[in-house]
């Protein structure tokens, strides 16, 4: 086994419930049992757990509730405390302390909050405490949700400068076709780079309790890989899966991280879900891609979404291709006013300015 490593383990609802309506306690105990010797050996373990809504529904004896966001948040509020209590009880069997962190998209979008979350996470790890992380579903609305714990786990892996991200699911890995409907589907063992062909292979989740299918796992793998983090998608029910993966055994589908990973700030730029889109003309597109230029207001054709200055947004071409992520120096309303204008006109149009560029090249990363 390698020297001390940082491992993020994401456990989906389908793994935690075994496909049923309640938490599969025996199976979760087994997963904790696999983590204990790794922790004792000096590895830094982080758990990203789903299951708050399922736990809340079980605790309230499966109430009949309207299918609304408020109902889900009610269940999450009740279930989150039950879920963290459960994790604490199990890890305490091995004299391991845990610390709870609840995150939202806003914690990832804002650079200062991102750094604060990173410092908290590292402090827990430095003191031998296992962080147990979930999205704060009790307060998060669509506008501030990461959206699924697959992508959340990739962002957590970036926060922690993790070596590996293990996505445990109800499937053995990524298949060439949907194994539930195609008996000829083959398990893909190694992936060097994610492309459109792989994305087409990704199927949806069959669990009504979860939010992430194989497509979101590919998105998470792509984000983590760009940061140099190795990702494995594997079956959570496979005996010894965590230890086998750490020992380098062939488990599930392994996505290799970039050999030249992004620097720390660039990782952050690619991590948060973009708060909005900026469509640019062909001239701006060429300047960004071929000359590494900053984005000027003159090259902006359209702005979508509502966002503040200092937030990560996405730059897109006129044919809808994702070109880059970057930090906008102007909010969305201001951008709509200065779009298509020269930089020297910004002050006259807005009555103020934060400089001649909308997104500086140092605050930008190509997709």
Curated annotation (Swiss-Prot):
Residues at which ATP binds: 10, 169-170, 211-217
One annotated GO molecular function: RNA binding
EC number: 2.7.2.11
Coiled-coil intervals, chain numbering: none
InterPro entries: AceGlu_kinase-like_sf, Asp/Glu/Uridylate_kinase, G5K_ProB, Glu/AcGlu_kinase, Glu_5kinase, Glu_5kinase/COase_Synthase, Glutamate_5-kinase_CS, PUA
Localization (cell): Cytoplasm
Substrates-to-products reaction catalysed: L-glutamate + ATP = L-glutamyl 5-phosphate + ADP
Record family assignment: Belongs to the glutamate 5-kinase family.
Segments crossing the lipid bilayer: none
Biological role stated in the UniProt entry: Catalyzes the transfer of a phosphate group to glutamate to form L-glutamate 5-phosphate.
SMART domains in UniProt: PUA
Annotated metabolic or biological route of this protein: Amino-acid biosynthesis; L-proline biosynthesis; L-glutamate 5-semialdehyde from L-glutamate: step 1/2
The entry's keywords: Amino-acid biosynthesis, ATP-binding, Cytoplasm, Kinase, Nucleotide-binding, Proline biosynthesis, Transferase
GO cellular component terms, semicolon-separated: cytosol
One GO process term, biological-process aspect: L-proline biosynthetic process
Protein name as it appears in the record: Glutamate 5-kinase
Binding residues annotated for substrate, in chain numbering: 50, 137, 149
All copies of domain PUA, residue ranges: 275-353
């Amino acid at each position: 086994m390698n020297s001390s490593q940082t491992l993020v383990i994401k456990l989906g609802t389908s793994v935690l419930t075994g496909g049923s309506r309640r938490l599969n306690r025996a199976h979760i105990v087994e997963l904790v049992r696999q983590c204990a010797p790794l922790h004792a050996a000096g590895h830094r373990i982080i758990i990203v757990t789903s299951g708050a809504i399922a736990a809340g529904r079980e605790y309230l004896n499966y109430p009949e509730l309207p299918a609304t966001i408020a109902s889900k948040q009610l269940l999450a509020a009740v279930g989150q405390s039950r879920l963290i209590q459960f994790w604490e009880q199990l890890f305490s069997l091995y004299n391991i302390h845990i610390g709870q962190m609840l995150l939202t998209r806003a914690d990832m979008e804002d650079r200062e909050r991102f750094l604060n979350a990173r410092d908290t996470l590292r402090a827990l790890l430095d003191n031998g405490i296992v962080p147990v992380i979930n999205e704060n579903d009790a307060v998060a609305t669509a506008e501030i949700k990461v959206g699924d714990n697959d992508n959340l786990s990739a962002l957590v892996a970036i926060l922690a400068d993790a070596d590996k991200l293990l996505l445990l699911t109800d499937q053995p890995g990524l298949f060439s076709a949907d194994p539930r409907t195609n008996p000829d589907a083959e398990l893909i063992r190694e992936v060097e780079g994610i492309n459109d062909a792989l994305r087409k292979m990704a199927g949806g989740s069959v669990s009504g309790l979860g939010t992430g299918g194989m497509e979101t796992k590919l998105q998470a793998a792509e984000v983590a890989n760009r940061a140099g983090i190795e990702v494995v998608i594997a079956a959570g029910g496979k005996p010894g899966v965590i230890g086998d993966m750490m020992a380098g055994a062939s488990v599930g589908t392994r996505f290799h991280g970039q050999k030249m990973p992004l620097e720390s700030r660039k990782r952050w730029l690619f991590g948060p879900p973009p708060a909005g889109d900026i469509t640019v003309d062909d001239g701006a597109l060429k300047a960004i891609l071929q000359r590494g230029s900053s984005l000027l207001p003159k090259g902006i054709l359209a702005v979508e979404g509502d966002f503040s200055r200092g937030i990560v947004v996405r730059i897109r071409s006129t044919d809808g291709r994702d070109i880059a992520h970057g930090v906008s120096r102007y909010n969305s309303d201001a951008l709509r006013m200065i779009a298509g204008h020269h930089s020297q006109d910004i002050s006259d149009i807005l009555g103020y300015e934060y400089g001649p560029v909308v997104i500086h090249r140092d605050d930008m990363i190509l997709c």
